[in-house]
Design a protein with these regions (language model features):
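Acidic catalytic/metal-coordinating carboxylates
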Residues: 34-37, 60-63
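Active-site beta3 strand of CheY-like receiver
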Residues: 45-51
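C-terminal output helix
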Residues: 87, 105-114
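CheY-like receiver
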Residues: 112, 119-139
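Two-component/phosphorelay signaling modules centered on CheY-like receiver
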Residues: 11-30
Length: 139
């Protein structure tokens, strides 16, 4: 089963992402609220996928992504950030991100990115009514 590490300094955003992933039938193995914790949790849990915010106290998401990629060149990282300027997206890809999702988050966009990054064989079911309601919440 594919496992996901959610990294965001905002508890509400982590909660929304967890609910989105669970509504898609995916397993959230851990959460982190900083880049440092993201790197530690990546080493501890070896998740199939990491969703990473950029702007966090301490180590930011771009630096954490680079460190994770140094540890595992095959790591799969999706950046989820409100900072979506063109240069930021380029920096995210250069740091190793496989996709970039601009906030506010939408269930359909999350589902598409997960399928793209993890591969077409991923068992992602259509979001249920509750999942779609959660996806409408602005993050």
């Amino acid at each position: 089963m594919n496992s996901i590490l959610i990294v965001d300094d905002t508890a509400f955003t982590r909660h929304v992402l967890r609910n989105m992933f669970e509504s898609l039938g995916l397993h959230v193995i851990a959460e982190a609220d900083s880049g440092e914790e993201a790197v530690r949790n990546y080493c501890l849990y070896k998740p199939s996928l990491v969703t990473m915010d950029i702007t966090m106290p301490g180590m930011n998401g771009l630096t954490a992504s680079r460190k994770i990629m140094e540890l595992d060149k095959d790591a799969k990282i999706i950046i989820c950030s409100a900072v979506s300027r063109h240069d930021t997206v380029i920096k995210a890809i250069q740091a190793g991100a496989r996709d970039f999702i601009a906030k506010p988050l939408q269930l359909e966009r999350i589902e598409w990115a997960v399928q793209k990054v993890l591969g077409t064989g991923v068992n992602v079911r259509q979001g249920d009514r509750q999942g779609k309601q959660i996806a409408e919440v602005l993050v």
